Amino acid sequence: MKILAAMSGGVDSSVAAARMVDAGHEVVGVHLALSAAPGTLRTGSRGCCSKEDAADARRVADMLGIPFYVWDFADRFKEDVIDDFVEAYAEGRTPNPCVKCNEKIKFAALADRAVALGFDAVATGHYARLQDGRLRRAVDADKDQSYVLGVLTPEQLRRAMFPVGDSPKPDIRAEAEQRGLLVANKPDSHDICFIPSGDTQAFLGARIGVRRGNVVDADGSVLATHAGVHEFTIGQRKGLGLVGPAADGRPRYVTSIDAETATVRVGTVEDLEIWEFGGEPVVWTSGRVPGQPIECQVQVRAHGSVVDAIVEPGAERIHVRLRTALRGVAPGQTVVLYRPDAEGDEVLGSAVITRD
């Protein structure tokens, strides 16, 4: 097969590319340039997609003896990931940019170009597994990335390969060391790659501006003012700007955000609990909408807790009823549905959470 190896410059994608070469495939490496302005993404020790990372990826490709290219997706990344991220926060939602990047960039824009150039599939360093077209959790539960891949359609999954999903992360590092790959001990990427400072609030404020509003309690009493709803997310406790402790002495958390009125409501930890929510749009990884309610498990954030639920399916929308209440569920987050079995949890589909 002719395989395009997406190489971030990290250890996982490097070993993934090496395994594709070992398997006898015709492999070409590509690094995605996602920033139009140099220095606006994290550097190699803190994240991905920097000039240093591109250089690391090129050196690994040279060691593997495969062609290597850098493809510029900066405009698509800004439009589909960064602008979407900013818009969501301005509307009081809490998005996951890694989910959006996989959906729109790595397995859409990149994969589309790969197919147009005659490649059969795109291989990445994601920790997940594909078995008979079914997306499953990785062997390494701590590194599992099936959550951020739960938005992929059947067509996208058919042209994807995850060569490291069957291995624990320590084994991947050991293999990289054994192969003599210079990235064997390179730190994992964390946080949001397009916010170099790590200050999400400042990043959003510079792009959204000031729209003052009130922080209120359950009965509508004003407790504080704020400069914009982008400063908050459901479940947030710190940085609320409250003038003093609540009468009962208990901490307060953000329980709802109304972007139209710029009102942020706070309450107790118990007020964060929810038992049901909606989700749209919906992706079913099999391409088929279940004909009846399904018993499954749901996860609402990367590496978050998993709870049992009953999901009423639909082609455009789902309704989730939880067996155990969850706290801090925010509109804009992605809910991923899993079916547990002996082969490893299977991803059934996903949706963007709505609270109505």
Swiss-Prot record:
The active site is at C101 (nucleophile), C193 (cysteine persulfide intermediate). Keywords: ATP-binding, Cytoplasm, Disulfide bond, Nucleotide-binding, RNA-binding, Transferase, tRNA processing, tRNA-binding. It comes from Mycobacteroides abscessus (strain ATCC 19977 / DSM 44196 / CCUG 20993 / CIP 104536 / JCM 13569 / NCTC 13031 / TMC 1543 / L948) (Mycobacterium abscessus). Catalyzes the 2-thiolation of uridine at the wobble position (U34) of tRNA, leading to the formation of s(2)U34. The lineage of its organism: Bacteria, Bacillati, Actinomycetota, Actinomycetes, Mycobacteriales. GO terms for cellular component: cytoplasm. The record marks H126, Q333 as: Interaction with tRNA. Signal peptide: none annotated. It is found in: Cytoplasm. Belongs to the MnmA/TRMU family. This is tRNA-specific 2-thiouridylase MnmA. It catalyses: S-sulfanyl-L-cysteinyl-[protein] + uridine(34) in tRNA + AH2 + ATP = 2-thiouridine(34) in tRNA + L-cysteinyl-[protein] + A + AMP + diphosphate + H(+). Disulfide bonds join C101-C193. GO terms for molecular function: ATP binding; tRNA binding; tRNA-uridine 2-sulfurtransferase activity. ATP binds at A6, M7, S8, G9, G10, V11, D12, S13, L32, G125. GO terms for biological process: tRNA wobble position uridine thiolation. The gene is mnmA. It holds the Pfam family tRNA_Me_trans_C. Residues 143-145 are annotated as: Interaction with tRNA. Transmembrane segments: none annotated. Its EC number is 2.8.1.13. InterPro entries: MnmA-like, MnmA-like_C, MnmA-like_central, MnmA-like_central_sf, Rossmann-like_a/b/a_fold.
